[in-house]
Amino acid sequence: MILPDFSQAKVLIVGDLMLDRYWSGGTGRISPEAPVPVVNVSGSEDRPGGAANVAVNVATLGAKVTLLGMCGHDENARILKEKLSSFDINCEFFEVPERDTITKLRVMSRNQQLLRLDFEKSFADVDKSALLTTFNQALDDVDIVILSDYAKGCLSDPQSLIRAAKQKGKKVIVDPKGSDFEKYANATLITPNVAELYAVVGEQDNEQSLVASAQSLKASLSLDGLLLTRSED
């Protein structure tokens, strides 16, 4: 498949930043303290996650990417920026001293995930006036906006971003989360998966009712399009 040329595209991505951390090693015994495997950790890898992973995917296509989000004032934020810089992504991170950078630690053995530990606290109650100011300034030099919502609080008020972008004639694509899609009204396109759509319209019995429900939701939210991804998560 031949992909279109994205080298001239300028994309502004706003959303929940995460660092995905993987510890891996062999398992050969059960802990004497509890009936759980003991992992002899021999490897560690950090990857951009959440909206940061979206930014990497878009940058890999050749687009010029600016990424806005909130993180802690900590080592994991530094690691995340370093990882993203290798993809020439312009990072506009707002560091919140009383928060940790959202980090998901997965313990792996023999290509299987044994455990996941989440280090996170919502950014929903954090003042976002500085982020909105930077967003408005960045709009003048981008072609399209992507809102990557993982319900971690950075996009607690997506309407303010959608309105600002649409006022400047920018298309807005939303990767939604949760059961309230009203907050994404008037976006250009939203891209829910099947489970996310069902959370809003209820489970559907057949393909015809699924399509009808999606079309009804598109109309009620005044969207230009609704792209349903065929996965459950």
Language-model region placement:
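Substrate-binding N-lobe of the ribokinase-like
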Residues: 3-4, 8-10, 32, 36-102
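A short, aliphatic-rich alpha-helical micro-motif
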Residues: 6, 139-140, 184-185
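Structural motif
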Residues: 12-14, 116, 143-146, 173, ...
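Short acidic, glycine-rich surface-loop motifs adjacent to enzyme active sites
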Residues: 142-154
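Positively charged, low-complexity intrinsically disordered leader regions
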Residues: 1-28
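Gly-rich Lys/Arg/Thr-decorated short loops/hinges at beta-loop-alpha junctions or inter-strand turns
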Residues: 32-39, 109-123, 192-199
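Conserved phosphate-binding/catalytic loop of the ribokinase/pfkB sugar-kinase fold
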Residues: 93-99, 106-141
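Conserved phosphate/ATP/ADP-binding segment of small-molecule kinases
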Residues: 152-233
